[in-house]
Amino acid sequence: MKIAAFGEVMLRFTPPEYLMLEQTEQLRMNFVGTGVNLLANLAHFQLETALITKLPANRLGEAGKAALRKLGISDQWVGEKGDHIGSFFAEMGYGIRPTQVTYQNRHQSAFGISEAKDYDFEAFLAEVDMVHICGISLSLTEKTRDAALILAQKAHAYQKKVCFDF
């Protein structure tokens, strides 16, 4: 069974050792996202996985694709658009101090500016058995919401299983 997801790949920056941003000059960098997390776990159990999304047409996009491949996620359906990636800083909580997350430029990310016409949903659906549509695609921008709904409709027409997270 091949399971795929439609959603955003983001770049997470995290200070080391529960430090706050103003307490460090170092950050850890990870490519993350709901779809990435889901597919990486399924790939760990030897299921075939793929992500359909957009990444920037630059070194960040290349690094994002490499990160997906390391996790066992096919990047065959990862296209390029624009030059930004959604990113956020996650300052991990400690004791009674809660975790704080600060997002950057998410609406202008490669995924955020993508629209249904940027994807070959028919060819994609011909190769997968199940599609997970990440909740962020429904709420990030009108274009991503429309693309998610079109993908769901086409998946239904192709008799593919569809699941969502909200």
Q: PLM features: what roles do these ranges have?
A:
Residues A5-F6, W77, Y103, V162-F164:
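General beta-strand structural signal in soluble alpha/beta enzymes
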Residues M1-S74, E115:
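Glycine-rich phosphate/adenosyl-contacting loop at the front of the ribokinase-like
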Residues F13, F111, S139-L140:
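Short glycine-rich, flexible loops that bind phosphorylated cofactors or substrates
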Residues A40, D118-E122, A126, D146-L149, ...:
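Amphipathic, non-transmembrane alpha-helical secondary structure
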Residues M1-K2, V9, I85, T99, ...:
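A generic secondary-structure signal marking the coil-to-beta-strand transition
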Residues E48-G135:
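Conserved N-terminal subdomain of the carbohydrate kinase-like
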Residues M130-F166:
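Conserved beta-alpha-beta core of the PfkB/ribokinase-like small-molecule kinase fold
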